[in-house]
Amino acid sequence: MSYFKLIFSNKSILRTLQIEEFESEKLTGNCIEFGANAKIYRNFLKADHNLYKSTFSNLNSENKDIIKIDLEKKLLHKKKYDNVIIFNVLEHVSDINIALKNTNLLLKENGKLFGSTPFIYRIHAAPKDYSRYTKDFIKKSLKKSNYK
């Protein structure tokens, strides 16, 4: 990824670093990306886009092509995915354990969860941010939600 492209992509420094880290992942199969109005990460991946299909979920989207899945409610969506992408999503939910259990239910066996959550308030203080998590808390929550 060229830094020129990233600098002029209108992304924050945090988002730029996340994209840089994530772009090396080789995604295959079906993916669902939460909080993604504009296919944020798909646009930056070096992966062959013919090897995977993306679905996007955002509760606030008015785009009818973007499905609405509330990670804090009983999961009615039955489709399973090879990859779940949740960058900058967990800080917007009031119960991380329910959200992580639901993302796990969306994954096929041996599926992968990709994501991050900001730790410093001033770095990403979007509306309706509820929490900040330490690495240890995230690990404990993932284990509690049956992630391996």
Give short role names for the model-derived ranges.
Residues F114-K139:
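Conserved class I S-adenosyl-L-methionine
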Residues S94-I98, A125:
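Short N-terminal helix/helix-N-cap motif within the alpha/beta-hydrolase-1
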Residues N83-V89:
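A short beta-strand submotif of the Rossmann-like class I SAM-dependent methyltransferase core
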Residues V89-L90, F119:
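Hydrophobic adenine-recognition pocket in adenosine-nucleotide-binding enzymes
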